[in-house]
Amino acid sequence: MKQLAAQPLPSRGLEDTLRRGNVWWQGERIFGLPPIRRWAFPHVLSNVTGGGLAPVTVVRGPRQIGKTTLLNQVIDDLLTQGVLPKRIFRVQFDELPELAKVSQPILDLAWWYSDNVLGKSFHQAARDGEQALLFLDEVQNLPDWAPQLKHLVDQHPVHVVVTGSSALRIEAGRDSLAGRIATLEMGPLLLREIGEMRGYGKIEPYLPSNGLGPLKDKDFWLGLREFGERHREFRLRAFSAFSQRGAYPIAQARADASWEQIADQLNETVIRRAIQHDLRMGAKGKRRDEHLLEEVFRLGCRYVGQSPNQALYLDEIRRAMHANIGWQRILTYLKFLDGTLLLRLIEPLELRLKRRRGASKLCLCDHALRAAWLQEVVPLDPDELERQPHLTDLAGHIAESAAGYFLRSIVNLDVAHFPERNAEPEVDYVMTIGEQRIPIEVKYRRRIDHRDTVGLRAFTEKAVYNAPFGVLVTLGEEAASDDPRIVSVPLSTFLMMR
């Protein structure tokens, strides 16, 4: 693994591909980068330029949400700042099948780059003030990527940015890279990013990026409600765009394209790409059942925001596939889909002395995927729902899913759901921060009465849960409860938090 013992690349074609993928080495710049930068941009840029504590920054998220664009924008900004082009090396691994012939692709490519482009060892480059910056896109399908990266950053002074669209494989690498890694989870567009992309203005996030502490303070949530009211016009316009087309960048950037075109694009480049490419091969090269993956994902879309039990899954799958499929296999495939970050399984809250009961709640990364896959458009916008009241119940489940995925994507935030237990009513979500818990209930309907807050009130009344207040996420703008322990926030304002 010594740097000076670099092995030649397996083909001249691979070297040509690498050079063409790093056009700045020839004095050129990347063409067609969007002017709008996603929320993760300043964090990645800061980490690359030495502002972070870890040498490796991992950006994970579903396919087609802008991870590669983010890397290219960071590279372009570095070049604008005057960083020498030869210091920057980018590799897009999912477009290099020839790497299958390379035993340790990350290390071999790093040594090749050091010898043939940087022209010196990584240590000498750092001493000369030319520390190498490596951008490794979609590494999750590489065997043993994490141990290779660990060796690289342990032995050589480099900064590395890694992207991946598999939570399972990226998470598996975190153990090898403990203490060397900073993780960012980037999902589809945030509501304020949708507004900026559509030209409605630009708003800074309400939640600071330096920790979860503010979430424990009731005044934070009251302030969030005021924040939403202060930016009402922007918020409602952005939420209407989100309701119509979802939060994938392609859907909002191409507002001129028809929904049918966008749906076809999402089905092919996001859902089928994940099922046919990311999940097609299991352990030891065994192929997974593509049809079963599609059916399990279809159920995830159909029961979004809900917690189906085993019997429902078994019955639906057997009817769809005319085969006797066992629960463990279905559960395994659900976890595979969770690994693609297209949907997240929110587990039931575990409490001391109480055996965990209840099924996982299904939260889809974007309701547009459901609309595309099931060919069933359900609006979230209050005005649209008033015109189509028969869709209100479905919209409620989708709103619950949107809130759950939004919470689950906040790094280091512990989120669970609270199933009905004996005499204790259900609560949609429970955030745990340190010793404190914050229950969250989503009630996406026009009228909310005392019965709709029974779960929040029961949870906050039990001293053992240490929940001084709860949050009620609503459809309408008006305060939905006069209980001083409950802060009501419209879904559109809730999604403006980040």
Where do the PLM segments sit?
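Conserved catalytic segments around the Walker B and adjacent sensor/switch elements
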Residues: T80-E95
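Interdomain motor-coupling "hinge/lid" segment immediately C-terminal to the ATP-binding subdomain
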Residues: G173-R302
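Accessory nucleic acid-recognition modules appended to NTPase machines
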Residues: K2-Q3, P8, Q252-Q436
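A short, basic N-terminal segment
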Residues: M1-L53
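Hydrophobic positions on the alpha1 helix immediately C-terminal to the Walker A/P-loop
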Residues: L70
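Short glycine-rich substrate-engagement loop in P-loop NTPases that contacts/grips substrate
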Residues: V91-G129
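Domain-level recognition of nuclease-like catalytic cores that cleave nucleotide substrates
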Residues: L475-R498
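Conserved lysine of the Walker
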Residues: K67
